[in-house]
Swiss-Prot record:
Gene3D superfamilies: 1.20.960.30, YVTN repeat-like/Quinoprotein amine dehydrogenase
Stored Pfam families: LisH_PAC1 (PF24951), WD40 (PF00400)
CC per GO annotation: cytoplasm; microtubule; microtubule associated complex; spindle pole; transferase complex
Oligomeric form and interacting partners: Self-associates. Interacts with NDL1 and dynein.
Localization per Swiss-Prot or TrEMBL: Cytoplasm, Cytoskeleton; Cytoplasm, Cytoskeleton, Spindle pole
Protein name: Nuclear distribution protein PAC1-1
Gene responsible for this protein: PAC1-1
Species: Podospora anserina (strain S / ATCC MYA-4624 / DSM 980 / FGSC 10383)
Main location: cytoplasm
Coiled-coil residue spans: 62-89
Swiss-Prot/TrEMBL GO biological process terms: cell division; establishment of mitotic spindle orientation; microtubule sliding
CDD domains: WD40
Domain LisH: 10-42
Annotated spans, Disordered: 78-101
Domain comment, as recorded: Dimerization mediated by the LisH domain may be required to activate dynein.
Length: 464
């Protein structure tokens, strides 16, 4: 036996461990032959010695396997970090340029108070308020700059599934929806008093979003909801009436995202599809159906205009489109993939990297990145200028499934707001400090703030 790489003592230990292993596995003839070959008499390998070395070989073997796995994991992690380093923007530029900013670990704040998994988060369009909803039936309002809980809102009788800030110009409201089949409206300027409850859906209400007042004559009074009853409904929040019902999905409608001009709505469903609706017409029908996912489609996002050049290049279009508020979209699924689509319903790219269900998506307001969260506990950043390559992974974003992600809306003076879409914010008259001043000349000021929520009961704030 070649033992050149072992010391004499190590070789003797190995020989005895092998003999003990052979003896324990009823291979006594083989063990005896090895003892003879190694000149180890019975007196040298007595029962006490055999007992001492019993199981040692197996322990050494499993230790080697564990070490090999750890080395492979570390090599993979090192490769990921090297890739991130090679493709990263210098830190000095990231700190100065919000367009290049990406979240990093650790989070600025971890917000703890919910007693059950967190399902949703939403930023106030101007102030440093964040709403979070949970399976504990409550909504909590936080000051995300200070990391402090401001109040707990009770009213729903089952899990809160989504929240959103928005509403009429100069009168920002908070909307929430629940497994109790209702949508509730709360007034932030009046201690979050419940001012209206909207019944009408026949099953759990999965998602709710205010529709921007970008279209001609838009008032900001419209709200869209998605439900397990397979429908989407559009509501007038000033009256509480359902003004349109959208039918087309064959299963539970999971998520909904309005376009910045309020004309289009993107929805996703358990029927494995996404659908784009033109809600400016009296009886909306799906304008485009996104077919390709192999499982339930849980989340969606509409790309901002700043992303058009990168997505157009990915789609092989020489000149980026500039006419529509919806030229490109993203969807995330239980099939663990993210798909990028054009307005015709053509899948232009499949982003692979998550190891579990993709739960939430948000485009960077600067247009270069798409961010995603998933049940693999991670937050991932995909670079649209590099064919959608994953350039950053926050592996410890949470200690359990990450269920939601929102980006604080950018701020522009005197322009209506919509939450989470890189849209514009305005004051609702609440006597609080704004979280950053409006940009000069009406230009949007990107707020480098992201919130995520998880089954680990934590809301996390990633901020510059």
């Amino acid at each position: 036996m070649n033992t050149n790489i072992l010391t004499t003592r190590q070789a003797e230990e190995l020989h005895k461990a092998i003999i003990a292993y052979l003896t324990a596995n009823n291979l006594s003839n083989t063990a005896s032959a090895l003892r003879t070959e190694l000149n180890l008499g019975e007196d040298v390998f007595d029962p006490a010695t055999a007992k001492k070395y019993e199981g040692l070989l197996e322990k050494k073997w499993t230790s080697v396997v564990r070490l090999q796995k750890k080395i492979m994991d570390l090599e993979s992690r090192n490769s990921t970090l090297q890739s991130e380093l090679a493709n990263s923007t210098p830190t000095s530029r990231q700190n100065k340029d919000p367009v290049a900013w990406l979240p990093k670990s650790p989070a600025r704040h971890t917000l703890q108070s919910h007693r059950n998994p967190i399902t949703c988060v939403a930023f106030h369009p101007v102030f440093s308020s964040l709403a979070s909803g949970s399976e504990d039936q409550t909504i909590k309002i936080w000051d995300w700059e200070l990391g402090e809980l401001e109040r707990t809102i009770k009213g729903h009788t089952k899990a809160v599934l989504d929240v959103d800030f928005g509403g009429p110009r100069g009168n920002t409201l908070l909307a929430s929806c629940s497994s109790d089949l209702t949508i509730k409206l709360w007034d932030p300027s009046d201690d979050y008093k419940n001012i209206r409850t909207l019944p009408g859906h026949d099953h759990s209400v999965s998602a709710v979003r205010f529709i921007p007042s970008g279209v001609a004559g838009g008032t900001g009074n419209l709200l869209v909801s998605a439900s397990r009853d397979k429908t989407l409904r559009i509501w007038d929040v000033s009256t509480g009436y359902c003004v349109k019902t959208l039918r087309g999905h064959a299963e539970w409608v999971r998520d909904v995202c309005p376009s910045i001009d309020g004309r289009f709505i993107l929805s996703t469903s358990d029927d494995y599809t996404g659908r784009l609706w033109d809600v400016s017409i009296p009886n909306p029908e799906p304008k485009t159906t996104l077919i390709g996912h192999e499982h339930v489609v849980l989340c969606c996002a509409i790309a901002p205009a700043a992303a058009y050049p990168h997505l157009a290049a990915m789609a092989g279009i020489k000149k980026p489109p500039a006419t529509s508020a919806v030229e490109f979209m993203a969807t995330g699924s239980r099939d663990k993939t993210i798909r990028l689509w054009d307005a015709r319903g053509t899948c232009i790219k499949i982003l692979v990297g998550h190891d579990n269900w993709v739960r939430g998506l948000v485009f960077h307001p600067g247009g270069q990145y798409l961010l995603s969260v998933a049940d693999d506990y991670t937050l991932r950043c995909w670079d649209l200028t590099q064919e959608g390559r994953c350039v950053k992974t926050i592996g410890d974003a949470h200690g359990h499934f990450v269920q939601c992600i929102r980006w604080a809306p950018s701020i522009v003076k005197d322009v209506p707001a919509v939450n989470g879409e890189g849209a514009n914010g305005e004051s609702n008259g609440t006597p609080r400090k704004a979280a950053g001043a409006a940009g000069a000349g009406g230009e949007a000021q990107i707020r480098c703030v992201i919130a995520t929520g998880s089954v680990d009961l934590n809301v996390r704030i990633f901020a510059n």
